[in-house]
C-alpha cells in the first residue's frame, strides 16, 4: 500500500519536527515547507494527498496561502486541515469566509489522537 503524502506548511521548525514524527507514526509520508512561500513553491513540484496549514506565518498568512491553493485548478481538490494556535472563534470572519475551503481545523496545542482522527477522516 502506498503511503499518503502530507505537506506541512508551517514556519516553526519545532512544530514541523513534531508533525513529521506524528505523521510517520501514523503511516503517512510527511514533507514540509518552512513558510507559505516555500509551501506554494513545493506544491508546484510535488504531488500531495493532504496539506496541514498553519495560519500565522511571517512571510504569507495561512488564509492567503489557502486562497492561492484553492484558486489553482491543479491544487484546488487537495484537502487542507488548518493547524493553528488561533481558535476559530478568534477569527470568525476569516473562518466563515473560508469555511468551504478547508476540511478540518485543529488548535495548537492539540491532542495527537484528535489530529490523526481528522487526517484519517479526510484521507482514509
Predicted segment positions?
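Active-site residues of response regulator receiver
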Residues: 54, 84
Amino acid at each position: 500500500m502506498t503511503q499518503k503524502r502530507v505537506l506541512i506548511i508551517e514556519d516553526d521548525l519545532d512544530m514541523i519536527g513534531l508533525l513529521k514524527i506524528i505523521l510517520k507514526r501514523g503511516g503517512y509520508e510527511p514533507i514540509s515547507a518552512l513558510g507559505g512561500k516555500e509551501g506554494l513553491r513545493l506544491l508546484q513540484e510535488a504531488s500531495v494527498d493532504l496539506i496541514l496549514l498553519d495560519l500565522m506565518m511571517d512571510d504569507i498568512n495561512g488564509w492567503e496561502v489557502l486562497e492561492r491553493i484553492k484558486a489553482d485548478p491543479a491544487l484546488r481538490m487537495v484537502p487542507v486541515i488548518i493547524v493553528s494556535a488561533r481558535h476559530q472563534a478568534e477569527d470568525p470572519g476569516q473562518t466563515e469566509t473560508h469555511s468551504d475551503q478547508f476540511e478540518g481545523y485543529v488548535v495548537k496545542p492539540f491532542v495527537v489522537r484528535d489530529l490523526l482522527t481528522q487526517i484519517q477522516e479526510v484521507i482514509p
